[in-house]
Amino acid sequence: MRYWYLRLAVFLGALAVPAWWLYQAWIFALGPDPGKTLVDRLGLGALVLLLLTLAMTPLQKLSGWPGWIAVRRQLGLWCFTYVLLHLSAYCVFILGLDWGQLGIELSKRPYIIVGMLGFICLFLLAITSNRFAMRKLGSRWKKLHRLVYLILGLGLLHMLWVVRADLEEWTLYAVVGASLMLLRLPSIARRLPRLRTRPGVS
């Protein structure tokens, strides 16, 4: 397997972060409401992984190194895993597995609906992130996986709705996300490989 060391590093890193959070919860280091803290951190971790996934193609075009693409799918699947953990933690720590409370939560907090839409879209990408699905779907596979842009928008909207007045951190992620979208515009994406051939650009 090519770039096995890079894949291993991504695997260990993505696994270590939630494991560390669970350890912090175990030793009561997550504050007065560790359940909510875990929910928030898993959601933010999923957004970071989504941005990293979207950054792989521009990085490959800028550097010419194929290792970035080698871990793109892995990062995307870890993003889905974090979202799944985020949703599970919400059901356990916020809802207390009281499904009757879910209707009340949805009416009071519409951002949950936005988050669920993002999860459904991400689920579709996760189950089709394999060679069998690529062969079966053909040209439709690329069209389906453009849902990643919608997922980013939904994720940022979900976070904006949650943080409300505290916009400093949200703005940072929004700017990074918008920049990655700009780099994917055909007129800009075509120029990225040329940048590494210019003098002074390695």
UniProtKB/Swiss-Prot annotation:
GO BP of this protein: protein repair
Q: Which InterPro entries match?
A: Fe3_Rdtase_TM_dom, MsrQ-like
Gene Ontology molecular functions: electron transfer activity; FMN binding; heme binding; metal ion binding; oxidoreductase activity, acting on diphenols and related substances as donors
**Which cofactor(s) does the record list?**
FMN; heme b
State the compartments where it is located.
Cell inner membrane
Cofactor binding: number and manner? Binds 1 FMN per subunit. Binds 1 heme b (iron(II)-protoporphyrin IX) group per subunit.
A single cellular component GO annotation: plasma membrane
The membrane-topology field of this record reads: Multi-pass membrane protein
Q: Where do transmembrane segments lie in this chain?
A: 8-28, 42-62, 75-95, 110-130, 147-167, 169-189
Q: Which UniProt keywords apply?
A: Cell inner membrane, Cell membrane, Electron transport, Flavoprotein, FMN, Heme, Iron, Membrane, Metal-binding, Transmembrane, Transmembrane helix, Transport
Fill in the subunit field for this protein.
Heterodimer of a catalytic subunit (MsrP) and a heme-binding subunit (MsrQ).
Q: Which NCBIfam families match?
A: PRK05419.1-2
The family assignment reads: Belongs to the MsrQ family.
Q: What this chain does, per the record? A: Part of the MsrPQ system that repairs oxidized periplasmic proteins containing methionine sulfoxide residues (Met-O), using respiratory chain electrons. Thus protects these proteins from oxidative-stress damage caused by reactive species of oxygen and chlorine generated by the host defense mechanisms. MsrPQ is essential for the maintenance of envelope integrity under bleach stress, rescuing a wide series of structurally unrelated periplasmic proteins from methionine oxidation.
Write the protein's name.
Protein-methionine-sulfoxide reductase heme-binding subunit MsrQ
Name of the gene this protein is made from: msrQ
